[in-house]
Amino acid sequence: LQMISDAMPQRRGMYLAFNKAIASEAQTKFHGNVDCRTFHSLAFRSVPRGVTDKLRLPRLSPSFIAKEYRLEPITLRRMMGGRYEKYVLMPSRLASLVANAVSHFCSTSSQYPAPRHLQAPSWLHPDDIDSLQKHLYPAIERRWLESIDPNHQAGIGHDIYLKLWALSEPNIPSDYVLFDEAQDADPLMLGILLKQRNTQVIYVG
């Protein structure tokens, strides 16, 4: 990667790493024409402050979400000993599924949350998985919209502002991008890079 940047001293480069420590170490090895960053640092600078300020707020617990969203116990069928039996998913468990669905959506290249982003337990009956996804979808959509609402006073994770940045289809400010450890990238990161129109992207790994 250093040789690539050395061969193009007149062009602005961007080295993208998965964490700040790797980016900081890389910055000491590249010349000044290469900026070393993480996806999150690029996103943090671009997303409205009202959203990133929510990183400092306390996160909503599953029990709070269950009560706030008025989630009720659901009786479904699960596989036990080679046959299906009735099983009750309690509100706090449903709330965790909702929160996890938003997190899963944030790691994808999808434009908007969908029922399929809810990852139901594999031991549920297939028909019940489908009905559970559809049943909880309004809660998933609400949780996402509240997460990106600067006026909603609840904490968020770093995945929220990264996803919001990705949805804006950002242009990375460089002539070329060096993406290290590309084999570990999720669909969100790859989606951002694939949409770069005027920037050469070099994948490594």
State what each model feature region is.
Residues Q10-R12, R59-L60, P173, N198:
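A structure-centric signal for secondary-structure junctions around beta-strands
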Residues I4-P9, A23-H31, A66, Y161, ...:
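Alpha-helix C-terminal capping segments
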Residues L1-K54:
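P-loop NTPase Walker
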Residues G13, G32, A66-K67, N151:
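Short, flexible active-site loop motifs that bind/organize anionic cofactors or intermediates
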Residues T52-R143:
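ATP-hydrolysis module of ASCE/P-loop NTPase motor domains
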Residues L132-G205:
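Conserved helicase NTPase motor core
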Residues F39-V47, H117-D128, Y161-L164, L190-I192:
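Short alpha-helical interface patches
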Residues K20, R37-F44, S92-N100, D130, ...:
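Non-catalytic, well-ordered alpha-helical scaffold segments
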